[in-house]
A protein has these predicted regions:
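Generic beta-strand or strand-like secondary-structure segments
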Residues: 59-63, 78, 100, 104
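Catalytic core of non-heme Fe(II) oxygenases with the double-stranded beta-helix
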Residues: 84-139, 143, 153-156
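Non-heme Fe(II)/2-oxoglutarate
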Residues: 1-68
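Conserved active-site beta-strand element of glycosyltransferases/polysaccharide synthases
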Residues: 81
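Short, charged interaction patches at domain edges and termini
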Residues: 159
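A short coil-to-beta-strand element that immediately follows conserved catalytic motifs
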Residues: 69-78
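Accessory, usually C-terminal, subdomains that scaffold auxiliary metal cofactors
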Residues: 148-152
Length: 159
């Protein structure tokens, strides 16, 4: 049985190349805005359906379909740069996010040994740069603990 079916999530290594990770992170950091009233999480910046990330979702679609053995329809893209102190509360996704992917682009931590996991159910998963987790967003509760770093440090994620 596939890990997506068994565990409700599947870790995928090297879903994005290092060059693509660098390009996307550089783009997002240049366009960083903090304090957006629409951001439900403290200490974060985000964009929904920005042109570049919408293109990325379509670029990643064949890989995600291959990994899931499903024909999928992209609904939206979401890009977030979490800053120190951010937290993602435990939740399940809305119906449109039946199959989701969370891809770590890049991060900058005060301590190079620090790890900030995405928790799937009761399992903390450290997603390395360029890797991703495909998951059943409506079925498995997921969250992140408090990002225990000073505000000038960050973690960049694509959904």
């Amino acid at each position: 049985m596939d890990s997506l079916e068994k565990n409700k999530y599947k870790y995928v290594k090297n879903i994005l190349s290092p060059d693509m990770v660098e390009f996307l992170t550089s783009y997002s950091l240049k366009n960083l805005t903090v304090g957006d009233e629409d951001v439900p999480l403290s200490s974060a910046s985000h964009s929904i359906n920005s042109e570049i990330y919408t293109h990325m979702i379509h670029y990643l679609l064949p890989t995600i379909e291959k990994e899931t053995n499903l024909k999928l329809k992209p609904i939206y893209s979401y890009n977030r740069i979490y800053l120190g102190g951010a937290e993602l509360k435990k939740h399940v996704d809305r119906a449109a996010c039946e199959i989701s992917a969370s891809i770590t682009l890049k991060y900058f931590y005060e301590d190079e040994n620090y790890k900030w996991p995405l928790c799937m159910g009761d399992t903390p998963i450290v997603i390395e740069s360029g890797d991703g987790v495909i998951y059943k967003g409506c079925e498995i509760p997921h969250w992140r603990p408090v990002f225990n770093q000073p505000k000038e440090y960050w973690h960049h994620q694509l959904f």
